[in-house]
Amino acid sequence: MTQLQFSESARCCRSKERAISMNKNESIAISAAIGRAISENAPYIAYSDTDLKHDYEEYTSDEISALTKAGYIDGDFEKFFVIREFSNSLPIDDIPGAYMRRLFSLAKKLDADIFMHDPYIENVKIKETRRGKILLTKADYVRGEILQYDMPYIDDDIVVPRLGFFTKSVCFPALYEGTVPWVSVCPSEINSMKEQMERACGRVLVLGLGLGYFPYIISAKSSVESITIVEL
């Protein structure tokens, strides 16, 4: 059994969590530590279907019900397993229960088939190209690799990252300066543009091309008359 276990008395879910209040600055610090762990280590959880089956069988039905009631499981044990394993690997001693519950509830098991059939991902082919320190290439997420799929959840009391993972490998265009990723067509980039892409209409001015995802997608909209791109 991993660090995410149950107290023998209340049978309540606990991980590296403590049942006390937390202020917003504390949640920001925890989220920053999680962000660093992801960006610096590209962590992934290696597991098989057999691992999932055996892990699930270690829980009683009452424990699964308690986890579900507490907001850790939403019917998808695989998602719970991956996020649990990642959270237990973090170099953080104490994480408040309210933060952990929000972290698990926001997490997503991303659909690799939907991502790879995105019109841009499916149709735009790139050839690896290097000019000086700049490299245009393909990046990837392997099965179980932890990523942030969208901007963090923010309200008056808490800031929590939106964690996700794919159940099989995916690849996508990316631009690097040296070893530093500058821009890529990854889930977080796509999701950050969704609202603007939905609202795009008429004559659209795009400031900065990036890898061209935004203008490519809106060019298919009948409501968009023209697209002007300004790139410095």
Q: Model-flagged regions — what are they?
A:
Residues 203, 225-226:
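Residues at the starts of beta-strands that form the adenosine-phosphate
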Residues 171-177:
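Short polybasic amphipathic segments
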Residues 173, 187-201:
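Conserved alpha-helix/loop element of class I SAM-dependent methyltransferases that forms part
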Residues 202-210:
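Conserved class I S-adenosyl-L-methionine
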Residues 228-232:
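Conserved acidic E/D residue at the C-terminus of a beta-strand in Rossmann-like folds
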Residues 178-187:
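Surface-exposed cleft-lining segments at the edges of enzyme active sites
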Residues 6-9, 16-165:
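N-terminal auxiliary segments of SAM/dcSAM-dependent transferases
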Residues 211-222:
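Conserved SAM-binding loop of SAM-dependent methyltransferases across substrates and taxa
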